[in-house]
């Protein structure tokens, strides 16, 4: 994809506001935007309205943004900022590049992911389904459509439609095993299927998939994701009433995550909730 400069222009932007907004964008938006081919730049703007805009093929594309949303006071507000940005990005990409383009499909997928972080699973599902339709049209069944099958499965899982979710998750796994072999994406599929089966109280089956996820991540050396798989395995053992094994796995996962120092990541926050639920302890203990 061509690299394009994307500008988020805000009037009367103070230094501390720039730093605050940069922090939220870095955590939820910037790296995904870079994957899409955009270089995000913040700058002051002479007009009254805040806008997100870029130039493509000698034409300017812009979307207005409510300035009040851009300076979050907490994590929830920060997510709303990033949701707003990705909503604007989907419109910009559709107008600039066309509906059935990878630009638009990617932006839809990222909007869906951000909505999932905000527990808006039904809205996220619609984004993933639309992105899947575009990517199947463009690429057929490949790694990109597998991403959407996986995300659709997770969204259905989140809204409690576990059997439907399982169908999509299995489809993603089938493609990833065929196209990628032992790969992080394949490990992710095994991990997500384990979660899905656990939600349906099929814990012995979930155990098989969780172990396969860990085996791949051990082989490729993805320590951070190994911790996430260990966390899931601990939850399964807890459901099987093997508290000792569950505690040992959680302790190991926590040690790995503490080594990264990512105390505010979504993964660590999730693990804190899990440990509090099972053992009544915080992640730091």
Regions found by a protein language model. Give the residues of each.
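N-terminal alpha-helical interaction modules that lie
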Residues: 8-81
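Conserved alpha-helical positions within TPR/SEL1-like repeat arrays
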Residues: 71-74, 102-117, 144-158, 184-199, ...
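Eukaryotic all-alpha helical interaction scaffolds
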Residues: 93, 135-136, 176-177, 217, ...
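Structural signature of alpha-solenoid helical repeat scaffolds
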Residues: 99, 140, 181, 221, ...
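TPR/TPR-like (Sel1-like) alpha-helical repeat modules
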Residues: 244-261
């Amino acid at each position: 994809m061509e690299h394009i400069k994307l500008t988020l222009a805000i009037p009367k932007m103070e230094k501390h506001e720039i730093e605050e907004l940069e922090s939220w964008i870095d955590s939820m938006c910037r790296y995904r935007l870079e994957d899409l081919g955009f270089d995000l730049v913040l700058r002051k703007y002479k007009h009254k309205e805040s806008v997100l805009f870029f130039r493509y093929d000698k034409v300017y594309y812009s979307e207005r943004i409510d300035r009040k949303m851009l300076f979050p006071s907490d994590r929830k507000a920060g997510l709303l900022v990033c949701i707003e940005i990705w909503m604007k990005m989907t419109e910009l990409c559709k107008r600039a590049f066309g509906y059935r383009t990878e630009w638009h499909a990617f932006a839809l997928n990222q909007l869906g992911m951000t909505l999932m972080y905000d527990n808006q699973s039904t809205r996220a599902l619609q984004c993933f389904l639309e992105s899947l339709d575009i990517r199947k049209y463009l690429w057929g069944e490949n790694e990109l459509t597998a991403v959407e099958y996986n995300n659709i499965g997770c969204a259905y899982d989140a809204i409690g439609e576990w059997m439907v979710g399982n169908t999509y998750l299995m489809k993603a796994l089938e493609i990833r095993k065929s196209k990628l072999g032992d790969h992080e994406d394949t490990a992710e599929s095994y991990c997500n299927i384990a979660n899905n089966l656990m939600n349906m109280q099929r814990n012995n089956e979930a155990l098989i998939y969780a172990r396969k996820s860990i085996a791949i991540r051990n082989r490729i050396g993805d320590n951070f994701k190994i911790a996430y798989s260990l966390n899931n395995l601990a939850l399964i053992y807890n459901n099987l009433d093997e508290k000792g094994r569950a505690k040992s796995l959680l302790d190991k996962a926590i040690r790995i995550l503490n080594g990264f120092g990512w105390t505010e990541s979504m993964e660590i926050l999730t693990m804190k909730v899990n440990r509090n639920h099972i053992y009544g302890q915080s992640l730091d203990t």
